[in-house]
Each structure stands twice: as C-alpha cells, then as structure tokens.
Design a protein with these regions (language model features):
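Hydrophobic core of transmembrane alpha-helices in multi-pass small-molecule transporters
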Residues: 135-150
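Helix-to-loop junctions at the C-terminal end of transmembrane segments
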Residues: 95-108, 194
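C-terminal ends and interior cores of transmembrane alpha-helices
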Residues: 117-131
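A membrane-interface helix-boundary motif in multi-pass transporters
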Residues: 192-218
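Multi-pass alpha-helical transporter architecture, strongest
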Residues: 1, 212-239
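Juxtamembrane intracellular "pre-TM" segments in multi-pass secondary transporters
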Residues: 3-50
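Intracellular juxtamembrane helix-capping segments at the cytosolic ends
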Residues: 150-164
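Short amphipathic helix-loop junctions that connect adjacent transmembrane helices
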Residues: 64-81
C-alpha cells in the first residue's frame, strides 16, 4: 500500500498544510489592509499607535533597567533594589490614581506629554548626577517611577477617545500588537548607549550611559505624538 506523505506530514506537524499557510497569509494581509485603511482615512489613529508603541517600550525600559543602574552606578545592594522596587510601585500606583483627575481636567494627551517630559528630565538628571550616591537615585528614581503609571493610563484613555465606535476591540488589539512589535527598541538603545559610553569613560564605568538610550526612545515617542491632536469625540467611520 502506498503511503500518503503529504497527509502524514501535516498530521504529525512536520509541514504546515496549504490551508494553514493561507490562513497565516490572510491574517497578515488583513492586518496590512487595516493599517492602510487607518493611514488613508484617519492617520492620527495610526500615528498614535506608532508613538505609543515606542514610548511604552521606553516606559518598560525604565523599570527593566532602573534596578541595574541603581546597583551598578549608585551603590545599591540587592536588598536596596528590592525595597526601592516596592516603594516605586506603590508611589506609581498612588500617582496613577491622582492622575485620573488630571486626565479629566487637562485631557489625556497633555498628561502623556507631561509625563514623558518629566521622565526625560529625570533620566537626564540621573545621568548627570551619576556619582551622587543612593540618596540621589532614591529622589530622582521615585519621581521617574511616578510618571510611568500616568503615561500608561492616559494612553489607554486617549486611545478610547480616538478610536471609532464599533472598532474598539480591533484597535485595542492593534495597540497590543504594535506594543509587542516595538519591544526591541529599549533594550537595543540601552545597549548601544552603553557601547558608546565605553569609548568615553571606559567599559567598566559606562553602565549609567544606558539611560540615554531610554531617553532617546522616550523622545522619539514624544516627537511622533506631536502629529496627534486631541480627539473631538469618537471617530464614526474608518472606511
């Protein structure tokens, strides 16, 4: 009896079936059509998705690499880093709650831009005062952490006001997808900044230069946000 290699390979998971390959390709084509439709009809939605994907990766980088910089540059012990992380998360949570009132008063776009601006300034101060010791990092680091939550919360509020009625699920799905797609930026720029700093201060002393990479990511997100204005209510049609 002759075997049926195509069916056997498909059943065993060795080779994807044509139908499965077509399904994957169809998904990418559908995604591309959605992005093109956004760009043509309401480009501000697409610009915000791009801007948010970038600066949200910078926000993630603040928490990811903050402890490393605290330990390698500011003399924190491992226990100090753990205590700081707990306090920073509590502070971030409290400030996020308070920022909800600012969101209603000023609008989410201003909260986003203000939070990112403070993050950039505090990051540059941490870089400039890298020899200030633990007290310096506690003061600047907590101010830095306090702006992460408001930026994240206001981003979701802003998107909810910007997207069209009836397309909330689809656009929030794109919001999550674009965020994952940009997740390489902060690690890459952090590494590049340290690599560049090694030529200036030496490899062993260049750890704090990584924060400049995070700053570049945040600034790029802010620049893209300049293309997005405050929404005047829901967009009613994307087609």
């Amino acid at each position: 009896m002759e075997s049926e290699p195509a069916d056997w390979e498909s059943a065993s998971g060795g080779v994807a079936s044509p139908a499965r390959r077509e399904s994957v390709l169809s998904s990418y084509r559908r995604l591309w059509r959605t992005l093109v439709g956004l760009y043509r009809s309401h480009p501000e939605v697409l610009w915000f998705l791009l801007a948010a994907a970038i600066y949200r990766d910078g926000l993630a980088g603040v928490f990811t690499y903050g402890g490393i910089i605290a330990k390698s540059t500011f003399g924190f012990t491992q226990d100090d880093v753990l205590v700081f992380a707990i306090v920073a998360n509590v502070v971030a949570g409290v400030v996020t709650i308070v920022s909800g009132y600012l969101d209603d008063l000023l609008g989410p776009r201003r909260v986003i831009m203000g939070s990112l601006a403070v993050l950039v300034v505090m990051s540059l101060l941490i870089f400039a005062l890298h020899d200030g010791g633990p007290v310096t990092f506690w003061a600047l680091g907590l101010l830095l952490s306090s702006c992460v939550g408001p930026a994240q919360s206001a981003s979701r509020t802003f998107l909810a006001r910007l997207i069209p009625k009836g397309r909330e699920g689809e656009i929030f799905g794109l919001y999550a997808t674009t965020g994952r797609a940009a997740s390489f930026l902060a690690p890459a720029m952090y590494g590049v900044a340290i690599w560049g700093g090694a030529f200036v201060v030496g490899k062993d002393q260049a750890g704090y230069w990584g924060i400049l990479g995070i700053v570049l990511v945040l600034v790029l997100g802010m620049v893209l946000m300049l293309r997005v204005s405050d929404p005047k209510g829901h967009i009613t049609d994307l087609d």
